[in-house]
């Protein structure tokens, strides 16, 4: 009730009755009008003193009990009527103090409008950033305050303006990749798949994948990329639907996140660090100490104890997907010797004859690699869902 009554009569309180504030305000206004070329430091000092005094008056006023402030309000209302100039100045001061109280969160808008029923008055505003050290009024903003002002400005203006549709967001290629049948030449070009290597690094075996040359860079034919990508997606979907093991390989910096998401979608595996020589051709020495277990068609462990022959049996992936075949040539050679089919992104400096299902495209850009990898992972995810749905029907 105390805050409610005080807020309801806050606008009626005439601060012109305070001689010190009136004198300070008039002296500051007259000084600024009579001396247009006044020193800036003197003006800042006068403004700081005025703001400090106003702030102290507001804080002391917010702590005055209701029993003491109501008689003062009644006396103020019972006094003689103010002149037109005084009423105008009082209205301007009331608006100023109201805006100041709202800006500094001394009171909320409902309290000032007389809509709040809170019984206590807050002496200090609630700080959402308790570790923030505010700067003085006559000092420039600190780096923390500038950051918060920019953050507040971004929050207020981020949704302004026109709504843009049909925009390509590269970060969605990892988590929300498109289906293979929804891929178009425009989407491939947006991801930068058409950009090949420099003409000086060209490998002649990729001649059939090249559309042309532009400023010393080969341009890949995206029509062929689209065809090869859909074929590779069918292979990934078929292997995943049959319960095969898919191994994703990418050893360049920044590819790990995409490999993780692809392995999760297909229940496969990935290698994001150096390829260990002999992983496929000498697996008994490389992976002999790894623990093995049996899983059913739903990829759930059966908890059955394996015999020594089953434990020593070599386990190979049913499909190897390579993102950067130029650096992982040894992995492709091991897959050929182990008769493991491979899928790889073939740039204009790569060798397509080492890959079972090549995909012509840019293997240097993370945007391009994540796009192609996301499409393959989405195809594998659909194959996995088909397998699980078929098993649940039985």
Swiss-Prot record:
The main location class comes to mitochondrion
Q: Where in the cell is it found?
A: Mitochondrion
Q: Which is one Gene Ontology cellular component term of this protein?
A: mitochondrion
- A Pfam family that this protein carries is Ribosomal_S2
Give the Gene3D superfamilies listed for this entry.
Answer: Glucose-6-phosphate isomerase like protein, domain 1
The UniProt record lists the keyword Mitochondrion: yes
Which is one GO molecular function term here? structural constituent of ribosome
Which CDD domains would you find in this protein's record?
RPS2
Q: Name one GO biological process term.
A: mitochondrial translation
Query: Keywords for this entry?
Result: Mitochondrion, Ribonucleoprotein, Ribosomal protein, Transit peptide
SUPFAM superfamilies for this protein: Ribosomal protein S2
InterPro entries attached here? Answer: Ribosomal_uS2, Ribosomal_uS2_bac/mit/plastid, Ribosomal_uS2_CS, Ribosomal_uS2_flav_dom_sf
* Feature: transit peptide: 1-25
Q: PANTHER family under this entry?
A: 30S RIBOSOMAL PROTEIN S2 PROKARYOTIC AND ORGANELLAR (PTHR12534), SMALL RIBOSOMAL SUBUNIT PROTEIN US2M (PTHR12534:SF0)
Concerning its family, UniProt says: Belongs to the universal ribosomal protein uS2 family.
Q: How does it assemble?
A: Component of the mitochondrial small ribosomal subunit (mt-SSU). Mature yeast 74S mitochondrial ribosomes consist of a small (37S) and a large (54S) subunit. The 37S small subunit contains a 15S ribosomal RNA (15S mt-rRNA) and 34 different proteins. The 54S large subunit contains a 21S rRNA (21S mt-rRNA) and 46 different proteins.
Which function does this protein serve? Answer: Component of the mitochondrial ribosome (mitoribosome), a dedicated translation machinery responsible for the synthesis of mitochondrial genome-encoded proteins, including at least some of the essential transmembrane subunits of the mitochondrial respiratory chain. The mitoribosomes are attached to the mitochondrial inner membrane and translation products are cotranslationally integrated into the membrane.
HAMAP family associated with the record: Ribosomal_uS2_B
Miscellaneous remark of the record: Present with 6890 molecules/cell in log phase SD medium.
Q: What protein name does the entry list? A: Small ribosomal subunit protein uS2m
Supply the source organism for this entry: Saccharomyces cerevisiae (strain ATCC 204508 / S288c) (Baker's yeast)
């Amino acid at each position: 009730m105390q805050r409610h009554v005080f807020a309801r009569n806050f606008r009626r309180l005439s601060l012109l009755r305070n001689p010190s504030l009136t004198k300070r305000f008039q002296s500051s206004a007259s000084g600024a009008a009579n001396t247009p070329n006044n020193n800036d430091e003197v003006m800042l000092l006068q403004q700081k003193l005025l703001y400090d005094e106003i702030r102290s008056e507001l804080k002391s006023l917010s702590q005055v009990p209701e029993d003491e402030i109501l008689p003062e309000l009644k006396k103020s209302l019972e006094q003689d009527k103010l002149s037109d100039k005084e009423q105008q100045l009082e209205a301007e001061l009331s608006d100023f103090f109201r805006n100041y109280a709202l800006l500094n969160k001394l009171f909320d808008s409902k309290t000032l409008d007389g809509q709040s029923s809170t019984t206590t008055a807050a002496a200090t505003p609630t700080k959402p950033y308790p570790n923030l050290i505010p700067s003085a009024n006559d000092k420039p903003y600190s780096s923390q305050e500038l950051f918060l002002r920019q953050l507040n400005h971004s929050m207020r203006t981020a949704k302004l303006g026109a709504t843009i549709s049909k925009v390509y967001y590269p970060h969605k290629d990892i988590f929300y990749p498109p289906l293979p049948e929804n891929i178009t030449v425009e989407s491939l070009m947006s991801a930068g798949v058409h950009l090949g290597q420099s003409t000086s690094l060209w490998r002649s075996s990729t001649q059939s994948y090249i559309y042309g040359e532009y400023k010393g860079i080969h341009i890949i034919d995206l029509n062929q990329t689209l065809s090869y990508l859909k074929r590779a997606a069918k292979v990934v979907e078929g292997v995943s639907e049959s319960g095969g093991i898919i191994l994703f390989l990418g050893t360049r910096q920044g590819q790990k996140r995409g490999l993780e998401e692809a392995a999760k979608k297909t229940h496969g595996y990935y290698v994001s660090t150096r390829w260990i020589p002999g992983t496929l051709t000498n697996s008994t020495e490389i992976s002999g100490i790894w623990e093995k277990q049996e899983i059913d068609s739903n990829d759930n462990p059966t908890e059955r104890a394996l015999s020594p022959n089953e434990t020593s049996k070599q386990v190979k992936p049913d499909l190897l997907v390579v993102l950067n075949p130029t650096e992982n040539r040894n992995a492709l050679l091991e897959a050929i010797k182990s008769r493991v089919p491979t899928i790889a992104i073939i740039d204009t400096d790569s060798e397509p004859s080492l890959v079972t299902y090549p995909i012509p495209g840019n293997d240097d850009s993370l945007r391009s690699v994540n796009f192609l990898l996301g499409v393959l992972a989405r195809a594998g995810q659909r194959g996995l869902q088909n397998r699980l749905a078929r098993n649940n029907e039985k």
